[in-house]
C-alpha cells in the first residue's frame, strides 16, 4: 500500500511532537522550580510533585548498572520509534486509534531519550502514594507511552471481539 504522506498515518506525527513538547516543558518547569531531591510539594493527600532522576527504565530498572543502560535504552527507543513510524507510513490517516497510540508512544519515547542523551538521566516528578507507600515517580513521557500501549492492547481486544462476532 503506497500512499502519499498526507493520506498516510504520518499525519498523526503532530501528536508525537505535541507529546514531546509537553513532556519537555513540564520537566523544564520542574528543574527550574523544584530543587533536586526536595521532599516534594503536596498537591493532594495522595499526590506530590517531586524532582528526582532515573538513570534506568521504568521503576528504575537497571539504574545502578554503570551507564551502559543509557545507550541501550536510547537505541531501543530509536528502534521502536522507527518501527512505529514505518507502521504509521503504511496505514491510512483514517486509522485514528492506532495513529494516536503510535504517536503518543513516539512522543513519550523521544522525550525520555532526549533526557537520557542530554542529561544522562530522565527527570521524573509525578509521585502518587497511599500513606507511606509511594509508586515510583514518573513523568508525562511515561504517561504518554503507557496510554499509547494501553490503546494498542485495547485495540487488540476490540479486534478479537469483532472476529468472534463475525460469522
From Swiss-Prot:
Pathway: Protein modification; lipoprotein biosynthesis (signal peptide cleavage). GO terms for cellular component: plasma membrane. Its EC number is 3.4.23.36. Keywords: Aspartyl protease, Cell inner membrane, Cell membrane, Hydrolase, Membrane, Protease, Transmembrane, Transmembrane helix. It is a multi-pass membrane protein. It comes from the Bacteria. The active site is at 124, 142. GO terms for molecular function: aspartic-type endopeptidase activity. InterPro entries: Peptidase_A8. It is found in: Cell inner membrane. One of its GO terms (biological process) is proteolysis. It catalyses: Release of signal peptides from bacterial membrane prolipoproteins. Hydrolyzes -Xaa-Yaa-Zaa-|-(S,diacylglyceryl)Cys-, in which Xaa is hydrophobic (preferably Leu), and Yaa (Ala or Ser) and Zaa (Gly or Ala) have small, neutral side chains. The keyword Transmembrane helix applies. The chain crosses the membrane at residues 12-32, 68-88, 99-119, 137-157. This protein specifically catalyzes the removal of signal peptides from prolipoproteins. Belongs to the peptidase A8 family. This is Lipoprotein signal peptidase. It comes from Aeromonas hydrophila subsp. hydrophila (strain ATCC 7966 / DSM 30187 / BCRC 13018 / CCUG 14551 / JCM 1027 / KCTC 2358 / NCIMB 9240 / NCTC 8049).
Amino acid at each position: 500500500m503506497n500512499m502519499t504522506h498526507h493520506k498516510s498515518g504520518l499525519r498523526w506525527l503532530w501528536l508525537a511532537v505535541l507529546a514531546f513538547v509537553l513532556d519537555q516543558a513540564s520537566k523544564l518547569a520542574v528543574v527550574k522550580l523544584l530543587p533536586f531531591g526536595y521532599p516534594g510539594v503536596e498537591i493532594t493527600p495522595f499526590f506530590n510533585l517531586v524532582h528526582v532522576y532515573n538513570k534506568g527504565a521504568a521503576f528504575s530498572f537497571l539504574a545502578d548498572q554503570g551507564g551502559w543502560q543509557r545507550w541501550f535504552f536510547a537505541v531501543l527507543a530509536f528502534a521502536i520509534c522507527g518501527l512505529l513510524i514505518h507502521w504509521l507510513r503504511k496505514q491510512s490517516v483514517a486509522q485514528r486509534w492506532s495513529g494516536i497510540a503510535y504517536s503518543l508512544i513516539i512522543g513519550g519515547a523521544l522525550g525520555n531519550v532526549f533526557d537520557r542523551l542530554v542529561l544522562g538521566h530522565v527527570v521524573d516528578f509525578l509521585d502518587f502514594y497511599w500513606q507511606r507507600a509511594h509508586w515510583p515517580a514518573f513523568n508525562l513521557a511515561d504517561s504518554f507511552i503507557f496510554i499509547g500501549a494501553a490503546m494498542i492492547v485495547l485495540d487488540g481486544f476490540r479486534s478479537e471481539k469483532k472476529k468472534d462476532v463475525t460469522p
